[in-house]
Amino acid sequence: MAVGKNKRLSKGKKGLKKRTQDPFSRKDEYSVKAPSTFAVRDVGKTLVNRTTGLKNANDSLKGRIFEVSLADLQNDEDHAFRKVKLRVDEVQGKNCLTNFHGLDFTSDKLRSLVRKWQTLIEANVTVKTTDDYLLRLFAIAFTKRRPNQIKKTTYARSSQIRAIRKKITEIIQREASTRTLAQLTKLIPEVIGREIDKSTHGIYPLQNVHIRKVKLLKSPKFDLGALLALHGESSTDDKGQKVEREFKEQVLESV
């Protein structure tokens, strides 16, 4: 047996083990607030590195996009398949004020809608709201059987598909171009779909008519006052107003 040093045993510590710092100790927690158009305002919490030197925490938060289920925002499980995107536009204190950034369907809902023996009709429309938001709305609809129909299939002719698509485009243009973004977000989930269904019934009966996606293409110049109004707040100094209302000047009747 060869006599020698066991390298593994004789190996000593070259240096002390580095002390690892918890990365969360350098972070702050901010609350994410949804616009007042939704029933539930508290979306959740988000983490960001504290302001150090030239790196401002507010700059890191602005522009963040959160995807939230519409069921959580409206306290209604019927909207569970809709996902709303909210973008942080302003940070006030520990609150992140968000604005609507888009809407989408869950993939499982979309897959469940597509079936055999029916025609899928899709349309997309680019519209501008009254407050200068440029949006692209994607509509989806499916044909259904007429009352007392014996035939298994419900295929629409090309001329009927074109007529339905034209009707969808007209309705979306009319509803979106005369409203603000906040008003439009209330209509998108159900109202526009029902309006399309009712208007196209004479061409071909439809089912599962939805605005499946909303894409924000362009936003107007940032306006803090408009964002605060959307969140039910005011950019004016409330303290000054309260003092004016409470204070009553005493008028002396006699000197």
From Swiss-Prot:
Modified residues (N-acetylalanine): A2
A GO term from the CC aspect: cytosolic small ribosomal subunit
Subunit structure: Component of the small ribosomal subunit. Mature ribosomes consist of a small (40S) and a large (60S) subunit. The 40S subunit contains about 33 different proteins and 1 molecule of RNA (18S). The 60S subunit contains about 49 different proteins and 3 molecules of RNA (25S, 5.8S and 5S).
Transmembrane intervals: none
GO terms, biological process: translation
Protein name: Small ribosomal subunit protein eS1
Chain residue ranges for the region called Disordered: 1-28
SMART domains, A to Z: Ribosomal_S3Ae (SM01397)
Species: Ajellomyces capsulatus (strain H143) (Darling's disease fungus)
Family per similarity comment: Belongs to the eukaryotic ribosomal protein eS1 family.
Pfam families assigned: Ribosomal_S3Ae (PF01015)
Cytoplasm listed as a keyword: yes
Molecular function GO labels: structural constituent of ribosome
Transcription among keywords: no
PANTHER family: 40S RIBOSOMAL PROTEIN S3A (PTHR11830)
Compositional bias (Basic and acidic residues): 19-28
Keywords: Acetylation, Cytoplasm, Ribonucleoprotein, Ribosomal protein
Gene: RPS1
